C-alpha cells in the first residue's frame, strides 16, 4: 500500500483566478481537480476499492477461477451505462461474496482512506452497512465494525492525520421494521464512532420507520437518507418523507428534487444539502446524460449540493472523475467547485471544532 511521498499543494481561493482550465489538457485538469481541497460526504466504504484490490481478493479466495481478470471485473462490477438501480444492487450483493474475513475489511478501509487522500480529499465521511457486509458469510457485525475502525485509524496515522475521516451507519438490507431498528440500535451503541445514520439500497418511503430515525437523532447522531435517486419511482414521496417526517439534514442523491419547484424551495428553506453523485446517477440510468444532469439546475436555483463518488469500486472511478464530468458537460467552474466544498464542510456531520480547523487550513 503506497503512501504518497509529496504533500498535495491545495488551492486557495486566491489561486483560482490565475488558473485557465480552457487551455489545459485532461491530465493537467486532473492535477487541478486533485488540488481542490475536497469534502466528500457520500461514499460507501464497503464498495470503495480498485480493480487491482478487488482482483487480489477474488484470486485469494479462488472465486471465478475460469474467468480472466477482465471477465471477473465485468461480471461483478458496474462500469457500463444504461443499467438500473435494481441491477446495481444485485451486483453489489455478489461483490459482498469477498467479505469472508475481517482482514479484508481492515485492508479495504486502510486502502480507501489512503486513496481518498491521494485524490485530494481533506474531510471524508465514509458510510457502510453492517448488515450488508455480514450478509454473505455471516460475519459478526461487531467485529466488522472493529476491523473498519482499525483500518481507518491505521491509515490516518500513516498519513500523519492529513485527512479527517468520519463514519455513517447505513440500514439497507431487508427493509423490515426489525432490520432497520437493528441497524439503528447498532448505530446508537457505537455513537462515539458514527456521526450519522442513513438508509440505502432499494429506495423506499421511510414514514413507517420514523421512530427509529427520531431515536437515533435523540442519541446525538445526524440524519441523511437515500431519496430522490431512483428515476423509476412513480412519485416523490421518499423526498417528502425524508424532509417533513424524518427531518433529515442532508439527502443522499436527491436529484429528483429538481422535478418540483415546491421541493426546491423546501430544501432551501430547511437548509438541506443534496449529496449528488453524478457518475453514479448516469451509470444507474437515473439521468439520461451528463449534459442534462439536474445538478446544474439545482445549483443555479440556490440549492446546496456537493460532489461525491458514491460507490467508486463498483464503477472503477474516483471523486476527480466526477469533477471532470461536471466541468466538461455542465461547465462548472473552479469557483463553483470551491463553493460546493464550502457547503459540504458546513453541512458535514463532524463537530464544529473540526470544521473550524479545516476551514482555516483549506477554505
Curated annotation (Swiss-Prot):
EC number assigned by the record: 3.5.4.4, 3.5.4.31
Cofactor(s) the record lists: Zn(2+)
Region named Gating helix loop: 170-184
InterPro entries attached to this UniProt entry: A/AMP_deam_AS, A_deaminase_dom, Ado/ade_deaminase, Metal_Hydrolase
Gene3D superfamilies per UniProt: Metal-dependent hydrolases
Top-level taxon of the source organism: Eukaryota
Keywords of this entry: Hydrolase, Metal-binding, Purine salvage, Zinc
Residues bound to a purine D-ribonucleoside: 44-46, 172, 201, 229, 253, 310
Top-level EC class as recorded in UniProt: hydrolase
Regulation: Inhibited by coformycin and methylthiocoformycin (MT-coformycin).
Catalytic reaction(s) noted: adenosine + H2O + H(+) = inosine + NH4(+); S-methyl-5'-thioadenosine + H2O + H(+) = S-methyl-5'-thioinosine + NH4(+)
A GO molecular-function descriptor: metal ion binding
Note on cofactor: Binds 1 zinc ion per subunit.
Pathway where it operates: Purine metabolism; purine nucleoside salvage
Binding site for Zn(2+): 42, 44, 226, 310
Important for substrate specificity for S-methyl-5'-thioadenosine, annotated site positions: 172
Its biological purpose: Catalyzes the hydrolytic deamination of adenosine to produce inosine. Unlike mammalian adenosine deaminases, also catalyzes the deamination of 5'-methylthioadenosine (MTA), a by-product of polyamine biosynthesis, to produce 5'-methylthioinosine (MTI). Plays an essential role in the purine salvage pathway which allows the parasite to use host cell purines for the synthesis of nucleic acids.
Similarity section: Belongs to the metallo-dependent hydrolases superfamily. Adenosine and AMP deaminases family.
Protein's name in the database: Adenosine deaminase
